[in-house]
Amino acid sequence: MAKITGEEDFVYVWTLGVEGLGDGSDKLVTVDARKDSPSFGKPIRSASVGGRHEAHHGGFTDDRRQFWAAGLSDSKIFIFDVASDPSNPKLVRTIDDFVQKSGGAAGPHGAYALPGRMLIPSLSNKDGTGTAALVEYSNDGDYIATQWLPTDKEQRGARVEKIADGYGYDARVLPRKNVMLSSSFTGIENYMRPLGDVVNDPEAMKKFGQTMVLWDFHARQPKKVLHVPGVPLEIRWAWGPYNNYAFTSTALTSKIWLVYEDERGGWKAKEVADIGDPAKLLVPVDISLSADDKTLFVDTFMDG
């Protein structure tokens, strides 16, 4: 996997709309990252999508000509042209039939570039209960395929370590090993509720993911369901050409987990570090691995 080198001219930030602020809509905000620019470090443009859609994650297509941004509440996906004028992105397409075309997946979580395609992991199904899928589109926004995550009832050929809960969140690929890894969160019935209500609802707290799925990437076939309790979220594969491992953090138990290839070519998961006291509900979310694979950065949702 060739690294992206150099420095960005602009940074795109997918932002939540706030009622009473501007038009109140979600927006893609452009920040000037040119060091010699008088507006360096400042927002210079915003592209409204109209309405609030629980803006969450986004990502570039493989050719970096488009930026895809997803809304968790109504399952809309917004496609921006960032190539024609990188300083002023334009909304060129809105996908509003994600649930219908995917066969019932809902809550598109992010956008992960594949060659000529975009991979969209969902957080839920249309019923809100959490059974999730990986949905693929062409770079132009045309639906291609849906792959549902394994469950205890429908294991889809996967070997299950303990349970197959079917929850989804992130998905990342290690192409040279033909391996894709997906993680797990919770369904719409939980993530669209106020966090305080969920935490104080014992039944709701039982409905969170504790699995990661190892896939045959080319076949899109789930091979093994790893037991990773505590809600594993973001996945980051190591960069080094011989480093066959990935990290994730668990939101409810505040742990760092390692997913690695053992000496026999099998894949395993183990916890390797504590982030903090889970009783304080730090909720580690995003993680970033440095380009030399030596430093892992973790941010926490509740205390900044």
Segments (PLM) and residue ranges:
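Beta-rich catalytic cores
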Residues: 1, 24, 54-56, 106-107, ...
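Short loop/turn segments immediately following beta-strands, especially the blade-tip
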Residues: 30-39, 79-89, 138-142, 258-270
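Surface-exposed loop and turn segments in beta-propeller and other repeat-based domains
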Residues: 42-54, 92-104, 146-166, 222-231, ...
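Short coil/turn segments that connect the beta-strands within blades of beta-propeller domains
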Residues: 7-9, 63-65, 115-117, 176-178, ...
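Beta-propeller blade signature
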Residues: 26-33, 131-141, 199-219
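Short, conserved, GDST-rich strand-edge loop motifs in beta-rich repeat architectures
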Residues: 6, 12-23, 121-131, 183-207, ...
